[in-house]
Amino acid sequence: MRVGYVPDRLSPPGWMTVERAMRHHAVFYRTWDARFAESLAARLRLPATRRLAHLSRGEAGKLSLLLALAHRPELLILDEPTDSLDPLARREFMELLLEFIADTRATVVISSHLVQELGRFSDWVAVMKDGTLIWETPTSGLRDAIKRLRVGAAPDLSTAGLPFTVLGRETHGREEVWAVRGWEPAMRSTLATRGVDLREVIDLELEDCYVELMRAPEPVEATHAAP
């Protein structure tokens, strides 16, 4: 399998120019597409004669993507690929990546903290906490399962034995807000029989789901959803 890798920071010899780096990488890949590489360089506005030591972080990130794509990998691994890019460059980066995926059907694995951005096009999401995988599911499954519940507060209100995991619990006057994992609409009736006054189920964006998982005080048991 042909594998491409985009590191969070490019570290080839600083004396190399962009053009020399492209020729250097081409030697190691039988499938290197020189014409494609040149078109990427033009599109990404990479100056061919500039030494790598003089590239900005954004330019270095673009060059990393070019070097990873030009041999047309079947699997592309990216480590914080847009961390150093401004909003416009980040959008151009993602558009180029999506075009490559559409053209080649390559599998792309991205490590990033820009959760909301990735959620717009990713099929599958895996969440890690303290080096441990705690959630693996289709992207839509994360938003379906993690909710905030607005409930009426009561002195003896307990979350023990409920059919979902309570990640967090906050009191706001006469109401409480629970962050829960494993929510299903059918659980409304269960809450009613337990005397819980459920007032609202709040849908969360992908980034909010990530935040709730990260700030849960107790370790969250790993969950692996079926494909």
Locate predicted features:
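ABC transporter nucleotide-binding domains
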Residues: 1-129, 134-135
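A generic structural signal for secondary-structure junctions
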Residues: 4, 30, 45, 139, ...
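Short loop/turn segments at beta->alpha junctions
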Residues: 17, 138, 202-205
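Generic structural signal for individual residues within well-ordered alpha-helical segments
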Residues: 22, 38, 91, 143, ...
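ABC transporter nucleotide-binding domain
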Residues: 93-185
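C-terminal coupling/interaction segments
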Residues: 179-227
